[in-house]
């Protein structure tokens, strides 16, 4: 491992952020810290993850939502101090890593099936040999 990777891993450990497991197709709620003058508040951005970019400290993801009939996409840096929390609302069942095709779709054709049996997977614990 080279020096840059070591420094990035130390920085990630220092940030001590808990990041949930999410994938493209999942519906997430991203709570963003917004500063307006002297006031600081949380703003929720709820949408579908259409892309995920894993690059260590520079990891990011794109969330798409429809607001007032207009498609809105926002790119978030995973380890940004502006992100208060990421909450996975619903797991999506998709077969692609990048869901850019959703940009050209609207209505029912833009819907994503929900992945069933996700809660059962979390409950399974490894069996210990006696």
From Swiss-Prot:
One MF term from GO for this chain? structural constituent of ribosome
Alphabetic keyword roster: Ribonucleoprotein, Ribosomal protein
Q: Which domain of life is it from?
A: Bacteria
Name recorded for this polypeptide: Large ribosomal subunit protein bL19
Question: SUPFAM superfamilies in the record, alphabetically?
Answer: Translation proteins SH3-like domain
Q: Name one GO cellular component term.
A: cytosolic large ribosomal subunit
Q: Which InterPro entries match?
A: Ribosomal_bL19, Ribosomal_bL19_CS, Ribosomal_bL19_sf, Translation_prot_SH3-like_sf
Is the keyword Ribosomal protein in the record? Answer: yes
What does the entry give for GO biological process? translation
Q: Record the organism.
A: Polaromonas naphthalenivorans (strain CJ2)
Q: What does this protein do?
A: This protein is located at the 30S-50S ribosomal subunit interface and may play a role in the structure and function of the aminoacyl-tRNA binding site.
What intrachain disulfides are recorded? Answer: none
The family assignment reads: Belongs to the bacterial ribosomal protein bL19 family.
């Amino acid at each position: 491992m080279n020096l840059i990777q070591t420094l990035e891993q130390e920085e990630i450990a220092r940030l001590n952020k808990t990041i949930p497991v999410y994938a493209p197709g999942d519906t997430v709620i991203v709570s963003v810290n917004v500063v307006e003058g002297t006031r600081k508040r949380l703003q929720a951005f709820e949408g579908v993850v259409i892309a995920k970019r894993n690059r260590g400290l520079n990891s990011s993801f794109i969330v798409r939502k429809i607001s007032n009939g207009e498609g809105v996409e926002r790119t978030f840096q995973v380890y940004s101090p502006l992100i208060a929390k990421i909450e996975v609302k619903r797991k999506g069942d998709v077969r692609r890593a990048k869901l850019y095709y959703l940009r050209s779709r609207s209505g029912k054709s833009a819907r994503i099936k929900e992945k069933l049996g996700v809660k059962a997977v979390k409950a399974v614990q490894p069996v210990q040999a006696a």
